[in-house]
């Protein structure tokens, strides 16, 4: 560092400030230090190398922090894996950060960028996005993964169409009273509820007003919601949980209370996680093609990093209904 300082005609403290991206250095002085670093092939660490090259070849990814959910969430793991595969194919690495649900993307960006650690940011839906429009407006490459965003480039599944397909399937089997277990309103749950309601409307069937219960995408919330729904005076003949975790909880409640699936009650989930094919009976669900979702999000981020002309603001990937043994016609329709 002292050799660089001597070559640039500055103090070693100034070189340190340039290397660490700290304020208080004029543009001219910074340029002299960077030129000296290049001429001397100075390689003190990742931050300085990034300054010299102009690229870190690392992308940050921010996902929700929930010890009981994040890394037990097969959909999220596949999404991360898809993004990482695309990054690796282009010689990039991933720096993963977890943040409390509902905020934290901006603080993660500041931490990543303070030492020039990342070239762009992928933000998963559950983190929240209040601070992201300012980042995107500043020209910083950022992509939201998993839900639509008006002001930030995004890649997300067609949640409404997926839920429509599930409800249409259950209606076609003969179910009329379909109970729904929804998720947090800030996430994809709103789109899934719209799809469910639209399927009823298109089938010209009356939507039951008393068969919706909230959940939080956990197994326990699905268990509790199933209990509330099945305790109705006129209980549903089918349950549609807005993710597989809650559907697994519903299956557990039904089994513990002597209800056969699908003999007494059909059950469907959403996300088509690994659990969907492992539970008994195997669960009807909607595949979000999570690996491809992560890969496409990374591709869009590279379009922004490389400043390609007119990258898409929104990419919507269709899901696929996967029918398994947990759904069947209700009694009296067989």
Task: Tell where the protein language model's regions lie, with residue ranges.
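Bacterial carbohydrate/catabolite-sensing allosteric modules
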Residues: 7, 39, 82-90, 137-144, ...
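A generic local structural motif
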Residues: 45-48, 106-111, 128-130, 224-228, ...
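N-terminal helix-turn-helix DNA-binding module of bacterial transcription factors
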Residues: 1-57, 331-334
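Short strand->helix junction
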Residues: 22, 69, 185-186
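Alpha-helical recognition/docking segments in bacterial nutrient-uptake
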Residues: 58-62, 66-168, 172, 229
